[in-house]
C-alpha cells in the first residue's frame, strides 16, 4: 500500500507541475498577444491619420477599401482575422505610399513612425509565435499532453508571417 501512495503522490506532483507550467505559458501567451494587438492598433491608427493627407490623390475605391479595413479591424480578436487585416492593410498602404511618392508627397515624421511601428510589430509577432511554440510543445509532449487533454488545454494558432 505504501508503494501505491508513493506512486499516486508522484503522479499528482507531475500533474500539478505540468498544469502550472501550461497555465503560466498560457498567461505569457495572452500577454504577448495583448502586446502585439496594441502594436497593431497603433499601426491602424497611423494609417487612419495618414489617409486625410493623401485623400485627394487616391481613387475612391482604394480609399473606401482602406477605411473599411481600418473599421473592420476594430474589435477583432481572432488571430487569423487580425493577421489577415494586418497584411491587407500593409498591401494597401504600399499602394498609397507609391501614389504619394509619385505625386512628390513626403511626410518624413509619419514615415518614420510607420516604419518604427513595423519593426515593433515584427518583434511582437516573433515573441508571440515563440510562446505559441512553447505551449504547443507542452500540449504535444508526454506527460503534459495527458494533463492538457484532461484540463482542456489545446494548441494555439501561430500569427502567420505572410
Q: Language-model segments: which ranges?
A:
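A helix-centric hydrophobic-segment signal that preferentially recognizes long
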Residues: 1-162
Amino acid at each position: 500500500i505504501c508503494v501505491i501512495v508513493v506512486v499516486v503522490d508522484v503522479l499528482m506532483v507531475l500533474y500539478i507541475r505540468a498544469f502550472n507550467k501550461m497555465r503560466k505559458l498560457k498567461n505569457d501567451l495572452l500577454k504577448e498577444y495583448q502586446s502585439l494587438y496594441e502594436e497593431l492598433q497603433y499601426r491602424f491608427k497611423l494609417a487612419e491619420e495618414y489617409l486625410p493627407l493623401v485623400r485627394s490623390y487616391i481613387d475612391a475605391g482604394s480609399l473606401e477599401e482602406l477605411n473599411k479595413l481600418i473599421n473592420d479591424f476594430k474589435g477583432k480578436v481572432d488571430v487569423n482575422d487580425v493577421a489577415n487585416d494586418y497584411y491587407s492593410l500593409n498591401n494597401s498602404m504600399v499602394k498609397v505610399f507609391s501614389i504619394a511618392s509619385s505625386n512628390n508627397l513626403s511626410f518624413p515624421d509619419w514615415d518614420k513612425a510607420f516604419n518604427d511601428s513595423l519593426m515593433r510589430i515584427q518583434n511582437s509577432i516573433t515573441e508571440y509565435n515563440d510562446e505559441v511554440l512553447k505551449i504547443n510543445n507542452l500540449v504535444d509532449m508526454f506527460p503534459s499532453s495527458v494533463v492538457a487533454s484532461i484540463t482542456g488545454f489545446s494548441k494555439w494558432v501561430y500569427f502567420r508571417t505572410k
